[in-house]
Regions:
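Divalent cation-coordinating acidic motifs and surrounding scaffolds
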Residues: 23-167
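Bacterial N-terminal signal peptides
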Residues: 8-20
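Positively charged n-region of N-terminal signal peptides that target proteins for export
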Residues: 1-6
Length: 167
């Protein structure tokens, strides 16, 4: 139940990202030629603080289920190519100077690498700065500028979004 609420919060972040946070696609930036592939870009943000001890396995499974849903998606009659980035946050083994945020993988099409990295994550400690990890994903990933590319951020954590220096 708690994880479903967390993923629902991730969908709220998605709306924010698509409306405000993604790189703007000005008409002059768009390529008028049709793309040969339909692309889906996902950023997975996972709270690895100690407060996630009892939830971490379920959170990983839910995030991976999201990836699998998009992996089977079609757009304009074509199978979508899925690119996934992975972040962890809230882990005391991460630097306070990075707001306890670490990019594990940039956007990649290697879903085996994403799965391996995701399921290796463990919990430790806890300063869960949701705003910082969201900002990092929005600002630092190489998001496709094509307006037809579906871009989404999914965050799984159990703390309020207002913690930390970035709200």
């Amino acid at each position: 139940m708690k994880i479903n609420a967390l993923l629902s919060a991730g969908l709220l972040v998605l709306g924010w990202m698509l409306g405000l946070g993604s790189a703007p696609c000005d008409a002059k930036e768009r390529d008028p030629r049709p793309r040969e592939e339909s692309v889906v870009q996902l950023a997975l943000l996972l709270d690895t603080s100690n407060s996630m001890d009892g939830l971490i396995s379920q959170a990983k499974s839910q995030l991976w289920r999201v990836v699998n849903e998009f992996h089977g998606a079609r757009q304009h009659g074509r199978q979508c190519v899925v690119e996934v980035a992975l972040y962890e946050y809230g882990n005391n083994s991460l630097s306070a100077g990075t707001n306890y945020v670490r990019q594990i993988l940039p956007l990649t099409r290697d879903l085996d690498a994403v799965s391996e990295a995701l399921f290796k994550l463990t919990t430790n400690g806890g300063e869960e700065y949701c705003g910082a990890v969201i900002r990092e994903a929005l600002d630092k990933l190489s998001w496709d500028k094509d307006a037809n590319t579906y871009k989404a951020v999914f965050i799984a954590g159990n703390e309020p979004f207002r913690q930390g220096p970035i709200e």
